[in-house]
Amino acid sequence: MKTVMATGTFDIIHPGHGFFLEEARKLGGEDARLVVVLARDSTVRARKRTPIVGEKQRLEVVRMLKPVDEAYLGSETDMFEIVHRIKPDIIAIGPDQKFDVDELRDELRRRGLGCEVRRIEKYRDAELDSTCKIIKRIRSMEFDEDSLKNC
């Protein structure tokens, strides 16, 4: 059985996340084990923006998703720490993640981690296929008190 590790923020779950996780799992074959590592809130703030959903809730939601066998929060100091613990055969990188696959592969080798690194293509079958698009849509909408009374 091959272990595939997928990483990401997973803030405001959308179809792109589901596609990424399904495709990541497929990389390991029929009996693959998919382990998801979520970026910590502090990491997201440093690299992107303040997450809408906190790390504990994001972790809880990801653990509920069908393709996922296990999910953990990543390290706040060394992103390779959890890779040593999980020992994946394959690391799946999302289309919007800012990693250079070759550089990541080289760093993994330097650290004695000989796993394969693969980038998953972008999901394009939904209008709202990214958290940023969802945030922009919400910000562009006008809400009155009546429409928010049941929130």
Curated annotation (Swiss-Prot):
Pathway: Cofactor biosynthesis; FAD biosynthesis; FAD from FMN: step 1/1. The keyword Flavoprotein applies. Gene3D superfamilies: HUPs. GO terms for molecular function: ATP binding; FMN adenylyltransferase activity. It holds the Pfam family CTP_transf_like. Its EC number is 2.7.7.2. ATP binds at T9, F10, H14, P15, G16, H17, D96, Y123. Its cofactor is a divalent metal cation. GO terms for biological process: FAD biosynthetic process; FMN metabolic process. Keywords: ATP-binding, FAD, Flavoprotein, FMN, Nucleotide-binding, Nucleotidyltransferase, Transferase. It catalyses: FMN + ATP + H(+) = FAD + diphosphate. It comes from the Archaea. It is an enzyme of class 2 (transferase). Homodimer. HAMAP family: FAD_synth_arch (MF_02115). Catalyzes the transfer of the AMP portion of ATP to flavin mononucleotide (FMN) to produce flavin adenine dinucleotide (FAD) coenzyme. Belongs to the archaeal FAD synthase family. This is FAD synthase. It comes from Methanothermobacter thermautotrophicus (strain ATCC 29096 / DSM 1053 / JCM 10044 / NBRC 100330 / Delta H) (Methanobacterium thermoautotrophicum).
